[in-house]
Structure formats: C-alpha cells, structure tokens
Swiss-Prot record:
Reactions listed under catalytic activity: DNA(n) + a 2'-deoxyribonucleoside 5'-triphosphate = DNA(n+1) + diphosphate; Endonucleolytic cleavage to 5'-phosphomonoester
Family: Belongs to the DNA polymerase type-B family.
Compartment list: Host nucleus
Pfam families named in the record: DNA_pol_B, DNA_pol_B_exo1, DNAPolymera_Pol
UniProt superkingdom: Viruses
Name the record gives this protein: DNA polymerase catalytic subunit
GO cellular component: host cell nucleus
Alphabetical keyword list: DNA replication, DNA-binding, DNA-directed DNA polymerase, Endonuclease, Host nucleus, Hydrolase, Multifunctional enzyme, Nuclease, Nucleotidyltransferase, Transferase, Viral DNA replication
Organism of this sequence: Human herpesvirus 1 (strain KOS) (HHV-1)
Subunit structure: Forms a complex with the ssDNA-binding protein UL29, the DNA polymerase processivity factor, and the alkaline exonuclease. Interacts with the putative helicase-primase complex subunit UL8; this interaction may coordinate leading and lagging strand DNA synthesis at the replication fork.
Stated role: Replicates viral genomic DNA. The replication complex is composed of six viral proteins: the DNA polymerase, processivity factor, primase, primase-associated factor, helicase, and ssDNA-binding protein. Additionally, the polymerase contains an intrinsic ribonuclease H (RNase H) activity that specifically degrades RNA/DNA heteroduplexes or duplex DNA substrates in the 5' to 3' direction. Therefore, it can catalyze the excision of the RNA primers that initiate the synthesis of Okazaki fragments at a replication fork during viral DNA replication.
The keyword Coiled coil is annotated on this UniProt entry: no
Length: 1235
C-alpha cells in the first residue's frame, strides 16, 4: 500500500488558500474587483473570453492508460453564488467556459494539483503506478504465494500488441493471433494488491455431429473449422476478415441433451474458440437450423467449472504447473491494472488454498453526493444532463473491511466549506477520524479529484444508499456527457475496462439500474434493506430509526440552495448532513454484512459477486446445473435467454424474484399512484412480470374461512416445499417424458410417476431409473447447509457470522430452483416441471385437509394417536377443521383444546401427517399456534401467537399515506380486539352469525369499549380545537406532475396550489403533505384557477414549470337561463368537488384557518376500519360500515360561522351515547324538554 495522506489538518485562516476565495471578479468598471488571492494563480477564468465551444477538449493521456494523469485545460463550470462579493443580481446561475491550467485542490491552507503524485497527498493512495511511472519504494518486490480473489475479469489479448511485454512463449501461443485472458483480482495476506492473468482458457459450444455432417458435408473436424472461418470472413463488416481455421479447434465427444428421459447419448462436435465475440456470432448466425449447446457460457464460467475446486471468491495458491512451469511476474511497465504486483500463468499454476477462511484487508468506500439545480429555479430536481445542475459535495468514508474500522473521512466540496465545530467534536468523541475537507473552484476539478481517489485508492467494495439508481448514474453522466471524460480506466483496469451503469427497467415507479466496474463491487444498501426488512418508508432516516435506533439531523432539500449561497459556514452544515448520511450507511453495512452472504452465493453458484447482485436468480442455478450436467455427460441447449459473459452486456430479460416471494412495498408506492397505474390484469395463467412469462397455474390456495377465531389455530408449514417436492418425485428436465411409449417398458408407479397437469399426461421416471439432476443439486446443497449449521454452535463469534451467511446463501439458491424452471424466457425453461411442482403442492394441501378432517374428527380418534391430548382438553365441544391453506401453510382451527397443549404437541401432529401422506424429504412442521386470529382474506390476517406476540400479514395498520390520527385509531381498535377479552368474546359471537342478522338487532354489549374508541375518534375529528397536524396525509411526487396520467390526485393539487402562490414547490421524490378541507366558495374559486394553471403547465415546454406572473382567472361561464331544475332565484347549484380538489397545503390551512372536511376524515377512518374488521361481518364492507356507524350519532355539522352564532345564542351540542339505548334515552329526554 502506498499512502499519501496525512492526519488532522490545521484550520484555514485568512491567509489560507480556499476554493473560489478571490477567484471570481464581479462584473464592474475596468479595474474594479477584489485584491490578489491568497495564493498566486495564473490564467484566472473570465467567462467572457473563452465561452464553451471555442476551445479544444482537454487533452487525453498518451500512455497505456485511459485515466487522466495529466490535464492542462478543462471545462470550468461553477455556481456564481461562490462569488460572495458580487451584488445579489450577479450571483444567479453558473460560470461556464474553459480554463487553461492544471486542476487544483485546496485543503487546510495548502494548494496542490489534483493529478500530482507525491508525498503528503490530501487523500490515501494505494496504487503503485500513476501515469506510467512506478512510485514503489526502492527494493519493493513482494513475494506472492497465497492470495485472495474477490473479482474475476476477462478480456481478449492479441499477440501482436503484447510483443513488447516479453511474455513467455506459452502465453504468447495462447493469444496467437488472439486469445481470452482471465484476470483474478485480489489481495495478499500482507495487503498487497495482486492481479493474476490466466492464459489458455477457451470457450466452447456443441453441435450435433450428425446434423452438422449432413448440412455442411463435413468429413472431419477440420472441415467444420474451415466452414466456420469462411462464414466469419463473409460476415458484414471487417471484424472477422482475418479469421482462419486455426482460430478453432473441434473434437468429437459423446453427450446427451438434458431434455427428456428418452433422449439417448449422441456424438457432438465440441468447438473451441478464442474469443467470446466470435462465439456469440457463430451461435447466433452460423447455420441457424442446427441447434447450439452451451454457446452462451462466458469464459469466466468456463474457467471456474472446467477446473474442479476453483471458486470466484476465495483463497488461491500459486504452484508449479505441468513440466514444472512457473508463473511469470510482469514488469511494472507491462501492468494492465492498478495492482502492486501482476503475474502471468496458466490454470495448472493455480490451486485452492482450503485452509484459510478469513478475509484480507479489503477496503470499503461509503459515499454520498449532494446536488443542486443551477438554473432559474434552484429548487428544481437536478438533472445530470444540464450543465448548470451541479454536484456540490461528496462525502467519502473509507473502511477496513476485515476490522470494520473507519480509517478516513473525506469531504469534497465545490467552494469553501467549514464543518461545524459541534460536528467535529461529536466525531472525536466517538473516536472517529477528523474529516479532511477538500475544496475546489469548479465541478470538473471536484469530480476529477473524486475519480482520482477512486483510481489511486482503489476500494474493492463500494456502498451507499440508492447509489445505483442516483449517485453513480448522476456522476457518470456528468463525467461522460458534460466533461467528456473516458471512464474505462477508472476501475482496476488501466484501460479497456468497464465502468458503466445500465437502466434495467422500472419497479413500482422506481428506476432500477445495475452497475459494473472492473475490480469494484458495488453493494447498494437501499436494495439490501428493501429485501431484508419491511418498512412503511425506506427513506434513510426512517431506516436508521428502525434498524439502528439512530436519527440524523435532517436537512430539507429546499434549504440547500440558501445554505450553499450563504458561505463556508452554512456549506459546512450541508457537509455535516452529507457525512452523516455516509456514516449511517456504513453502520447499516456492518449491521447486515451483505458482502458475506453475497460472496457465499457467488462461491456456491460459480459466478462473481457483481453477477450475484444484479443478474437475478436464473444464472445462479444455471451455472450449478451446468457443472453437474458436465459431470453426468449432459449438455444444455441454448435458449432465447442465453446469458452473456463478463464483457458487460446485460441479459435481455433479467430474471425477477419468484412469484411466491414477498416483496416489500417500495418508497413511493402510494395508494393513489397504484390506482392511477392500475388497469386490467392479465389472466392468472399467463402473466408477464419483469421479464418473466409464467404459463402455468400457480399454487393452490384453500379459501379462508373468514372471521374472528378465539379458539387455538395451529399453523403447519411445509419445510422447503418446492425443493422437497422436486427431490421426492425426482422431477427434472432429464427425467421427464411427454410420451407414454417412452416409458412403456417400465412399471407404472414403481418406475415412474404419471401425473395429469393442465389436461396433459406427464411422466417422470424414478431415481433408480435415472436420477434427477435438480434433485442431486438440492440434496448436495441441503447436506452442505446442514453440515454448516451444525458447526455454528462450536464456532467463534466471527466464524459463526460467516457460517450463518453461508447457510443462508444455500437456502436462497435452493429456493431459486423451482422458479428457474418456470420462466418461459429463462435460461433453461421447463414449464412442465414447474407446473408439476405446483400441481403436486395443490394435491398435498387437499390430501392434508381430507386426512385431518377424517383422522381426527372425534376427540377419541385424536387420543388414539396422541394419548397426551387428554391433558390438553379445554371447555366446550371438540372439533378440528382446516380454515385456510396458502401454498405451503395450513391453518387448523382446534376447538376444545388448549393453545399450550397444541403448541407442545404440534410437531408430533406434523410428523404424523408427513409419515402418513408424503414421500421424504417432504415434511410438515408446526410453525406457530394462534390464540386469536382475525382471518380477513387470502394472505391477509392478524393474530396473536401463543406467548402474546401479534403477527400481521398483508394488512397495513400504519400506512405511510394515512394521517397519524387514522393510523393511531386503527391500531387502538386492533389492540382492543385482541387484548380485551370482553371485546374478543363479543366479536367472536358477532362473527358466528350472518352479517345481515345484525342489521335488525343490537350489537353485542361487549363491543361497548370498541364503540367508545370510535365515538372518541368522531369527537376528536369534529373538535374545533383539534391539532391539524394529526390529520395531515402525504403522498410521494414520484415524477414530474406533467408525467402523471391521472392528474386528479390530491398531492398534485397541492403542488399546483404552491406553484400558483409562488411558494417553494416540492422536488421529485419528496412526499407532499396535504389535508382535505371543507368545500367553500373560496375553495371553489381556487379550484377553477388551478384548472387553468394545469392547462398552462401541460402546454409548457421544458422539464420544470415556471410559476405564472399572475394567477390565471377562471374561464367565464355563459349566462344560463333559469330552468325548472334550478333552485329558487335561478342560481345553479355548485358542483360537488372531488376529494382530490379539496386538498390543501397544511401550512396554508393553519395560517388561514381553513376548515377541515370532517365528513371526509370520518369516512376515511371508517373505510380503514372496514378493510380490517369486515371479516367480523362476512367480509361485507357495506354492512360493516353501516354497523360501525351505529356507534356514531347522526349529527348536523353546521358551517363554522353558523356554529359560532349558535354557541353565542346559548345552544350547545349534545353527543350520542355509547349504545343505541343510551342515545334513545337522551333523545327522549330532549324531546320531553322541548315539549
């Protein structure tokens, strides 16, 4: 490691060099302006001398690298607010031009060139080479025997271009004329960065020999090579003009197509090629009538699978190869990466070092960026393609991954920045490093410095929060589109590398991207959090509160422009905000340790970590199946979903998660937006989901017996249902047959399973006839998982964490197998297997229901199987009935038995059913016992588990787009239902009768406490002294208002009202607060004006609407002739406004005393309650609402001015009683008084 950064820096004084300090000269008379800057500089920028486009682009590097090591001219863009002595009218917008000088950085009173390498640098450096110059200390020659690999690259080298490197002849032969080279990137135990270039790996594919010979008239393998070379030379373009038959090698082997039992072994040509590009062209274009096999397998996968024991993440050892050949060290001037040492070798020079499990001292960078729009509207959402929208700060935290120690804190700032003393003291008190503040005059210099840090320090792992969808795309777009900086040299490769972001689609209105950087593994904690935990909001602050019990000092985005323009002290507040974001993300990273689980999946699947993160579940199973198929003599055919290699292209159809996996609701998926985007759904049998086309019937769900159950409900769960079905019934591509004659020589039932799926008969041979490849994979994985879990109790805490991540990774891959077969456009689809799995699952649910109902219908039958049941009898009649079945869970209602006894006996009952009905390894397990259960609908229930814990599934009691008042009331009602035995008993009695009966009779007396909550809620809603903040609703502005299809949304109404009032409008991704107000004449007039404003905005060009100079007047309505339908006087009745039109900004409503719409809020409360409690009334929402309203008095709500007059006249409001009888007595008394 080559370090170039110091410790705490002295604070800058008046004489210190500061970014933009005296740099800009305000416009004025000749000779006017500030005095000389603190440090002497030349070529001060004048925006009027060199406008954009009049100068040449910055000169690029001339060495064998493409990162910037020299730069003497660049495009200069900086906000005018940094010119703090200029008059206010001159401080809007940005400076934009070209500047002739080296990029500068200022830190702690010092100034230096960004690209200069030397002692005393401002940031740490680990790279040995910079700009073609070796900066290693004298005598630096580390010995490398053992090294850890974390990433694997592949590229194509040409012998002609590598002659000067003085490689050994065997390496030159491997790339003559071209050849694929696998590069292993890693770290030695001593911390030296190493790159091992492995020569001799070749990709290959298969074609049926008989078909090839018939179509191409081939008599020998060489003939096939000649035909392929000729086809390539005749291809469009000049890429393959020099191809000859020597580029290929063909041999004849015996293999079996993996599809169908009746497929017999045959002879195939195995064709080796020297580059993935040639392979891809041949598989796509050479003799399309001939089926290709395994043509989409990249070189990295071949390297791992063709060398038994090799892994994508783990320890390797260099050793002598065949004929005692040794690995060849590369001379520093021949390095292709920013490593400390590089070697050339072949695969036989490598061996796995199995005795080491710890990770070396890899480095983790956690970063966050802050941006600001620079146009006329500084509150607009920044767009990377706009030169005036700038990155103003970047926080960078550098950790040691093995020790979790935070080693460096860096803050890149556009303009001068003074962090608050309180923040520095807080960091010091926590034992964290003092931040190093790096200041810059222009955005280019700051971005170049950041990328230079990325190159020189070279963190192996990078994390942040939503960096894949925002931070990295914004930075890369800035660098490539605005500043024309080549990025292919900023990963571990010095040139011809990959540093790219792909947009791979939308999810819940949220853009989804993937990133690939050579030698840098990006793990976005936003994706990790949304996968691991379910929260109502995934904003970083909400996640920190829920997971870390920590809370950041939030800074509103709309405050950033003002803070930034004020000066260094306020820019320091932004810097503190930026640093604390990175600190929180770092804490989340070490809380979840995602790299351990991801690396375990990568090792198991034989793919690198980047593919594990971004390439879905399909590739994980495919590579494992590919390895096993080769061992068993099978080959896998290419499909439409053939995956690409590490060359960078993303799969055409990225695989989604399994349909039966629960996905957390993402930030921004508000109810109104789901309604807006809603449309007709496709039929159940043919769904397309993020690239998945599923063409078979899904899992069986036994319809729930909705209601409130106060007797114990035992929940049995199938352990690993789908994997166990595949194992038990030997399901696979290779054991399937669609033809009865193919299994005619076998004995039905004994030798094969016959099953009808979707009206078609399918046959699967048993394991003794041919063992399923999928079963072998699952058996080996589960045995490995069991062995790993058994080691955890005896392990050290550190090793236990690693082992737990490994067993979790195996579980994830096992659960991917079923989904792998069921994706029609996947890598190796077999819908018959997937459909058979779900069919057997449905039959198992039905068989379990029939068995339980028949076997334990009477208590005596239960006693016969379980004598201990005699001690668990509870008062009341006995019965056992299944009330719900959902894919892999069965809910059994047990009357007359105690919850404690059922909990103790549940596993025995599950084992009994498993032995009686299912083949191993299928087994039921007792998952939990509910003491009370409100079963609402499929996948929606609330229950209290034996022991007191409440479990809520599919029901949002606390919704992020509901107001606090409704959320609190809903939760209070649920707690009352489950924890008040009087209410629970009354609710159970209520649910046992048809809902219609309660329309004509009083509700049970035990519901009085339940009704009291509703009465109190109604009182608080109608209370003139209510706190309006309790009634604020929110919705996310997921995109620009102009991009919404449905404009009649409450939060859009507020957006346009704010714009009309020339107030600060929310930015995209902000949650817009609003309240629903009463309809008044003033509200009606505002709505009319807003309609005109919406029309103006819809017609306006550009990305952001400009506020109107004056509010548009509503369109004049023509005089109407009074009709018989009009009210007296001829005035037409006002239109009842939509709820979305009644939305108002809470701050405006409070300031102007705007009345709330109490009817709306109570209806909203009743609606929320009905969704949850309709199960008490036969799931009839209309009857539920009608009965709940019984608790509330029918009262007239006069307008506020009328109510004030009534109170002044001595009238008072009389509330309703808690019951209908009490209300009747009060009314009787009132009428007697009036009489």
């Amino acid at each position: 490691m080559f370090s170039g950064g110091g410790g705490p820096l002295s604070p800058g004084g008046k004489s210190a060099a500061r970014a933009a300090s005296g740099f800009f000269a305000p416009a004025g008379p000749r000779g006017a302006g500030r005095g000389p800057p603190p440090c002497l500089r030349q070529n001060f920028y004048n925006p009027y001398l060199a406008p954009v486009g009049t100068q040449q682009k910055p000169t690029g590097p001339t060495q064998r690298h493409t990162y910037y090591s020299e730069c003497d001219e660049f495009r200069f863009i900086a906000p005018r607010v940094l010119d703090e002595d200029a008059p206010p009218e001159k401080r809007a917008g940005v400076h934009d031009g070209h500047l002739k000088r080296a990029p500068k950085v200022y830190c702690g009173g010092d100034e230096r060139d960004v690209l200069r390498v030397g002692s005393g640098g401002f940031w740490p450096r680990r790279s040995r080479l910079w700009g073609g110059v070796d900066h290693a200390p004298a005598g630096f020659n580390p010995t490398v025997t053992v090294f850890h690999v974390y990433d694997i690259l592949e590229n194509v080298e040409h012998a002609y271009g590598m002659r000067a490197a003085q490689f050994h002849a065997r390496f030159m032969d491997a790339i003559t004329p071209t050849g694929t080279v696998i590069t292993l990137l890693g770290l030695t135990p001593e911390g030296h960065r190493v790159a091992v270039h492995v020569y001799g790996t070749r990709q290959y594919f298969y074609m049926n020999k008989e078909e090839v010979d018939r179509h191409l008239q081939c008599r020998a393998p060489r003939d096939l090579c000649e035909r392929m070379a000729a086809a390539l030379r005749e291809s469009p373009g000049a890429s393959f003009r020099g191809i000859s038959a020597d580029h290929f090698e063909a041999e004849v082997v015996e293999r079996t197509d993996v599809y169908y039992y009746e497929t017999r072994p045959a002879l195939f040509y195995r064709v080796y090629v020297r580059s993935g590009r040639v392979l891809s062209y041949l598989c796509d274009n050479f003799c399309p009538a001939i089926k290709k096999y395994e043509g989409g397998v990249d070189a990295t996968t071949r390297f791992i699978l063709d060398n038994p024991g090799f892994v994508t993440f783990g320890w390797y050892r260099l050793k002598p190869g065949r004929n005692n050949t040794l690995a060849q060290p590369r001379a520093p001037m021949a390095f292709g990466t920013s490593s400390d040492v590089e070697f050339n070798c072949t695969a036989d020079n490598l061996a796995i070092e199995g005795g080491m499990s710890d990770l070396p001292a890899y480095k983790l960078m956690c970063f966050d960026i802050e941006c600001k729009a620079g146009g006329e509207d500084e509150l607009a959402f920044p767009v990377a393609g706009h030169p005036e929208d700038l990155v103003i700060q970047i926080s960078c935290l550098l950790y040691d991954l093995s020790t979790t120690a935070l080693e460096h804190v860096l803050l890149f700032s556009l303009g001068s920045c003074d962090l608050p003393e309180s923040h520095l003291n807080e960091l010091a008190a926590r034992g964290l490093p003092t931040p190093v503040v790096l200041e810059f005059d222009s955005e280019f210099e700051m971005l170049l410095a950041f990328m230079t840090l990325v190159k020189q320090y070279g963190p192996e792992f990078v994390t942040g929060y939503n960096i894949i969808n925002f931070d990295w795309p914004f930075l890369l777009a800035k660098l490539t589109d605005i500043y024309k900086v080549p990025l292919d040299g900023y990963g571990r490769m010095n040139g011809r590398g990959v540093f790219r972001v792909w947009d791979i689609g939308q999810s819940h209105f949220q853009k989804r991207s993937k990133i690939k950087v050579n030698g840098m593994v990006n793990i976005d904690m936003y994706g990790i959090i949304t996968d691991k935990i379910k929260l109502s909001s995934y904003k970083l602050n909400a996640v920190a509160e829920a997971v870390l019990k920590d809370k950041k000092k939030d800074l509103s985005y709309r405050d950033i422009p003002a803070y930034y323009a004020t000066g260094p002290a306020q820019r320091g507040v932004i810097g503190e905000y930026c640093i604390q974001d990175s600190l929180l993300v770092g804490q989340l990273f070490f809380k979840f340790l995602p790299h351990l689980e991801l690396s375990a999946v990568a090792r198991l699947a034989g793919i690198n970590i980047t593919r594990t993160i971004y390439d879905g579940q399909q590739i994980r199973v495919f590579t494992c199946l590919l390895r096993l198929a080769d061992q068993k003599g099978f080959i896998l055919p290419d499909t439409q979903g053939r995956f690409r290699g590490a060359g960078g292209e993303a799969p055409k159809r990225p695989a989604a998660a399994r349909e039966d996996e629960e996905r957390p609701e993402e930030e921004g998926e508000d109810e109104d937006e789901r309604e807006e985007g809603g449309g007709e759904r496709e039929p159940e049998g043919a769904r397309e989901t993020a690239g998945r086309h599923v063409g078979y019937q899904g899992a069986k769900v036994l319809d729930p017996t909705s209601g409130f159950h106060v007797n114990p409900v035992v929940v049995f769960d199938f352990a690993s249902l789908y994997p166990s079905i595949i194992q038990a019934h030997n399901l696979c591509f290779s054991t399937l047959s669609l033809r009865a004659d193919a299994v005619a020589h076998l004995e039905a039932g004994k030798d094969y399973l016959e099953i009808e799926v979707g009206g078609r008969r399918l046959f699967f041979v048993k394991a003794h006839v041919r063992e399923s490849l999928l079963s072998i994979l699952l058996r080996d994985w589960l045995a490995m998982r069991k062995q790993i879990r058994s080691r955890i109790p005896q392990s050290s805490p550190e090793e236990a964490v690693l082992l737990d991540k490994q067993q979790a990774a195996i579980k994830v891959v096992c659960n991917s197998v079923y989904g792998f077969t069921g994706v029609q456009h996947g890598l190796l689809p077999c819908l018959h297997v997937a459909a058979t799995v779900t069919t057997i699952g449905r039959e198992m649910l039905l068989a379990t229901r029939e068995y339980v109902h028949a076997r334990w219908a009477a208590f005596e039958q239960l006693l016969a199987d379980f004598p201990e049941a005699a001690d668990m009898r509870a008062p009341g009649p006995y019965s056992m009935r299944i009330i719900y079945g959902d894919t892999d869970s069965i809910f059994v209602l047990c009357r007359g038995l105690t919850a404690a006894g059922l909990t103790a006996m549940g596993d025995k009952m599950a084992s009994h059913i498993s032995r009686a009905l299912f083949l191993p390894p299928i087994k039921l397990e007792c998952e939990k016992t509910f003491t009370k259960l409100l079963l609402i609908a499929k996948k929606k229930y609330i229950g209290v588990i034996y022991g007191g814990k409440m479990l809520i599934k599919g029901v949002d009691l606390v919704r992020k787009n509901n107001c606090a008042f409704i959320n609190r009331t809903s939760r209070a009602l649920v707690d009352l239902l489950f924890y008040d035995d009087t209410v629970s008993g009354a609710a159970a009695a209520l649910a046992e009768r048809p809902a219609e009966e309660w329309l004509a009779r009083p509700l049970p007396e035990g519901l009085q406490a339940f009704g009291a909550v509703l009465v109190d809620a109604h009182r608080r809603i109608t209370d003139p002294e209510r706190d309006i903040q309790d009634f604020v609703l929110t919705a996310e502005l997921s995109r620009h208002p102009r991009a919404y299809t449905n404009k009649r949304l409450a939060h859009l109404t507020v957006y346009y009202k704010l714009m009309a009032r020339r107030a600060q409008v929310p930015s995209i991704k902000d949650r817009i607060p609003y309240v629903i107000v009463a309809q008044t004449r003033e509200v009606e007039e505002t709505v009319a004006r807003l309609a005109a404003l919406r029309e103006l905005d819809a017609a306006a060009p550009g990305d952001e609407p400009a506020p109107p100079a004056a509010l548009p007047s509503p369109a004049k309505r023509p005089r109407e002739t009074p009709s018989h339908a009009d009210p007296p006087g001829g005035a037409s009745k006002p239109r009842k406004l939509l709820v979305s039109e009644l939305a108002e900004d809470p701050a405006y409503a409070i300031a102007h005393g705007v009345a709330l719409n109490t009817d709306y809020y109570f209806s909203h409360l009743l609606g929320a309650a009905c969704v949850t409690f309709k199960a008490l009334f036969g799931n009839n929402a209309k009857i539920t609402e009608s009965l709940l309203k019984r608790f509330i008095p029918e009262v007239w709500h006069p307008p506020d001015d009328v109510a004030a007059r009534l109170r002044a006249a001595g009238f008072g409001a009389v509330g309703a009683g808690a019951t209908a009888e009490e209300t009747r007595r009060m009314l009787h008394r009132a009428f007697d008084t009036l009489a």
